[in-house]
């Protein structure tokens, strides 16, 4: 129920809302993501600003200025690379628009979200959360 070119951004805004709720419930003080500036349409500066506008928590992005090769090297160093390349479907692969917005506006995102039951969807997601401890 929203413009296709905003699918990814709206999903990311929903993920940030859900993440903030879960973080606050667990006593966390910030959100941490693995984004690298400009690697994909949803990681341009305008897209990140639009995504971050739904949270009041700090969003830490330790990889923000690194290129893909640097990130791959780090993932190998911490034994995360093999897991990171496992095939699976996620919202970014299933719902990727043909022409995603690279310079979104906050007002357009907010307008597109008006047709969604945002609070209800967040509540449902938070209540359905399962936690796993990875050692």
Residue positions per predicted region:
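The feature marks non-catalytic terminal segments
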Residues: 86-135
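A short alpha-helix-loop-beta-strand transition element characteristic
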Residues: 79-87
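Short active-site-adjacent structural elements
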Residues: 40-42, 68-72, 84, 93, ...
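Active-site adenylate/phosphate-handling loop in enzymes that bind or generate adenylated species
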Residues: 2-78, 121-134
């Amino acid at each position: 129920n929203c413009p296709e070119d905003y699918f990814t951004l709206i999903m990311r805004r929903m993920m940030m809302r859900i993440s903030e709720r879960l973080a606050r419930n667990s006593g966390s003080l910030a959100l941490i993501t693995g984004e690298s500036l400009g690697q994909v349409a949803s990681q341009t500066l305008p897209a990140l600003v639009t995504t971050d506008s739904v949270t009041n928590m700090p969003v830490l992005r330790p990889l923000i200025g690194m290129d893909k090769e640097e990130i791959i090297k780090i993932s190998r160093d911490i034994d995360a690379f093999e897991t990171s390349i496992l095939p699976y479907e996620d919202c970014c692969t299933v719902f990727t628009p043909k022409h995603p917005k690279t310079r979104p506006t906050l007002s357009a995102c907010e307008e597109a979200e008006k047709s969604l039951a945002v609070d209800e969807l967040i509540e449902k997601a938070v209540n359905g959360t399962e936690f796993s401890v990875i050692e």
